[in-house]
Regions:
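Proteins synthesized as precursors that undergo proteolytic processing into mature forms
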Residues: 1-76
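Cofactor-centric catalytic regions
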Residues: 53-113
Length: 113
């Protein structure tokens, strides 16, 4: 799989979430890119560390984080500050086809021919 994202401080978090969803949870690349993301830290001029979770995440996820003492804040989905990822996955035992994915948080599109 080749993939990347723009997004400054959020790049490692976005790349990790996409890779984990493909490798560990078996999502295709578009599903992995589309899924709600989390952003922790100080980003894009914030004055303090924040834990942002896109609002498309289940409410139970917000509740569980709050119960553990995390001051999580909802971020509108799609939230461009979460980075805009693109990916291509080569054929393998999981699929005989190439897979492409583009982030709905940006202006890309995945096309095949």
């Amino acid at each position: 799989m080749v993939y990347g994202t723009q997004g400054g401080e959020v790049q490692p978090q976005t790349q990790t979430s996409v890779a984990t969803r493909v490798v560990d949870f078996g999502l295709n690349v578009q599903e992995a890119i589309d899924a709600p993301r989390v952003l922790y830290g100080r980003s894009w001029g914030d004055t303090s560390n924040k834990l942002l979770l896109e609002s498309a995440a289940p409410e139970a996820t917000f509740d569980a984080l709050r119960e553990q003492g995390h001051p999580v804040e909802p971020a509108q989905w799609p939230f461009p500050r979460m980075g805009t990822a693109q990916a291509i996955r080569l054929p393998g035992p999981w699929s005989p086809f190439f897979e492409g994915g583009a982030d709905p948080r940006g202006e890309g599109i995945a096309l095949g021919f």
